[in-house]
Amino acid sequence: MAKHTVKVGVAGRFGPRYGVTVRKEWSKYYVQKKAYYVCPKCKQKKVRRIANGIWECRHCSYKFAGGSYNPEYSAEIVREVAGNV
């Protein structure tokens, strides 16, 4: 039996479906979404995503808005939003 997770990590659960490029891209965002991040308030590495764009620290219960897959916004998004205001 072939190993599905050598190239694509957690996306190996899809087996041979969807192609390796799509599975690699999905895997990159999925790992970002599920990772722990540093809390901006208490500096503990306990921040997890609760919903799309909503992040919560499991240590101090601090909730804040952030990106969809990452609590920090990228510089490109900040420039784009600032340009539209």
Curated annotation (Swiss-Prot):
<dbReference type="InterPro" id="IPR011331">
    <property type="entry name" value="Ribosomal_eL37/eL43"/>
</dbReference>
<dbReference type="GO" id="GO:0070180">
    <property type="term" value="F:large ribosomal subunit rRNA binding"/>
</dbReference>
<dbReference type="GO" id="GO:0003735">
    <property type="term" value="F:structural constituent of ribosome"/>
</dbReference>
<feature type="binding site">
    <location>
        <position position="57"/>
    </location>
    <ligand>
        <name>Zn(2+)</name>
    </ligand>
</feature>
<dbReference type="Pfam" id="PF01780">
    <property type="entry name" value="Ribosomal_L37ae"/>
</dbReference>
<comment type="function">
    <text>Binds to the 23S rRNA.</text>
</comment>
<keyword id="KW-0687">Ribonucleoprotein</keyword>
<comment type="similarity">
    <text>Belongs to the eukaryotic ribosomal protein eL43 family. Putative zinc-binding subfamily.</text>
</comment>
<dbReference type="GO" id="GO:0005840">
    <property type="term" value="C:ribosome"/>
</dbReference>
<feature type="zinc finger region" description="C4-type">
    <location>
        <begin position="39"/>
        <end position="60"/>
    </location>
</feature>
<keyword id="KW-0694">RNA-binding</keyword>
<dbReference type="GO" id="GO:0006412">
    <property type="term" value="P:translation"/>
</dbReference>
<keyword id="KW-0479">Metal-binding</keyword>
<keyword id="KW-0699">rRNA-binding</keyword>
<feature type="binding site">
    <location>
        <position position="42"/>
    </location>
    <ligand>
        <name>Zn(2+)</name>
    </ligand>
</feature>
<feature type="binding site">
    <location>
        <position position="39"/>
    </location>
    <ligand>
        <name>Zn(2+)</name>
    </ligand>
</feature>
<comment type="subunit">
    <text>Part of the 50S ribosomal subunit.</text>
</comment>
<keyword id="KW-0689">Ribosomal protein</keyword>
<dbReference type="InterPro" id="IPR011332">
    <property type="entry name" value="Ribosomal_zn-bd"/>
</dbReference>
<keyword id="KW-0863">Zinc-finger</keyword>
<keyword id="KW-0862">Zinc</keyword>
<dbReference type="GO" id="GO:0008270">
    <property type="term" value="F:zinc ion binding"/>
</dbReference>
<dbReference type="InterPro" id="IPR002674">
    <property type="entry name" value="Ribosomal_eL43"/>
</dbReference>
<protein>
    <recommendedName>
        <fullName>Large ribosomal subunit protein eL43</fullName>
    </recommendedName>
</protein>
<dbReference type="InterPro" id="IPR050522">
    <property type="entry name" value="Ribosomal_protein_eL43"/>
</dbReference>
<feature type="binding site">
    <location>
        <position position="60"/>
    </location>
    <ligand>
        <name>Zn(2+)</name>
    </ligand>
</feature>
<dbReference type="GO" id="GO:1990904">
    <property type="term" value="C:ribonucleoprotein complex"/>
</dbReference>
